[in-house]
């Protein structure tokens, strides 16, 4: 139980803290370092899993394949506006491999695919958003596996959560501060994208 708390604290506390500190302290000038911190913090739970010998090479290969499929899916569907299968792949990884793997799949999909689409100050937010979706899918795996309707609702809400977290970045991007009315305006403006 203590290891699970440590793992979750890295993913739920340290990763968002790194993203927020990166935005507040470095503005948009050091996003590469913030992305590196997010990547390293997201690997700590996996390293702790190695310590228990719960991870084998088969799981690592499957994780690598899921990340590769997510990156390829994002690239192959890039010509279709507002449709990317990344969230679905991250949710599948979280449900069937565990929350640590789901977080890593989400975070590394954003990091690696942005080598194609362009790295920027939004990358740490994408890493955290997709990672959080994988983490939540892993934590709710038993419920999501039992009922297809709940899984479909979760998938839709995961897309909304991703958009919501990216709207936080958009609000920061304007002038480096959080302005609640601007944040609401960003959410309202993004509704056509969010519901697709």
Identify the meaning behind each predicted range.
Residues 56-59, 99-104, 144-149:
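Membrane-helix interface segments
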Residues 44-48, 86-102, 136-140:
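Generic transmembrane alpha-helix motif of multi-pass integral membrane proteins
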